[in-house]
């Protein structure tokens, strides 16, 4: 497998979360700071109370670990919001395919 230019913990988390959500049907959530800026994006599985991101599945309460920002909280985010903040349409087909492969591994 070739080396990736994507970094799912530093900016490309919305791409991976969208791919995981598409595959699993689970909703997308964000870790937001005190000013409601999205610092990290993940998928939330309500049935197990777990978050899924590039680190794998973990208790939802731990999803904020190692995420920078003041007054972090979690809230549901829309695809439209992620498009506006992270520019999901700017990713190439190759990058989407790479994220979908990673998502399949995580789901």
Regions found by a protein language model. Name each.
Residues 1-107:
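A structural boundary/capping signal
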